[in-house]
Amino acid sequence: MAKGVRIIITLECTECRTNPNKRSQGVSRYTSTKNRRNTTSRLELKKFCTHCNRHTVHKEIK
């Protein structure tokens, strides 16, 4: 059988990782799917972070 084209990825807030002065403890993470053929590089999306309480850039992690 062939591998599926779509894979599940995890998106993590970039500002929660680096900024210790935030509203609450923790790191915001979202799960999503991406097409392996169309998007070969790491995905970056603007999503709402509940810990920073605003929209921030979320990058794909392993």
Swiss-Prot record:
Keywords of the record: Ribonucleoprotein, Ribosomal protein
Keyword hit for Ribonucleoprotein: yes
GO biological process, one term: translation
Entry superkingdom: Bacteria
Matching PROSITE patterns: RIBOSOMAL_L33
Entries under SUPFAM superfamilies matching the protein: Zn-binding ribosomal proteins
Keyword Ribosomal protein attributed: yes
Cellular-component GO terms for this entry: cytoplasm; ribonucleoprotein complex; ribosome
Pfam families for this protein: Ribosomal_L33
Cystines in this chain: none
GO molecular function, one term: structural constituent of ribosome
Family membership: Belongs to the bacterial ribosomal protein bL33 family.
Protein name as catalogued: Large ribosomal subunit protein bL33
Source species: Trichodesmium erythraeum (strain IMS101)
Gene designation: rpmG
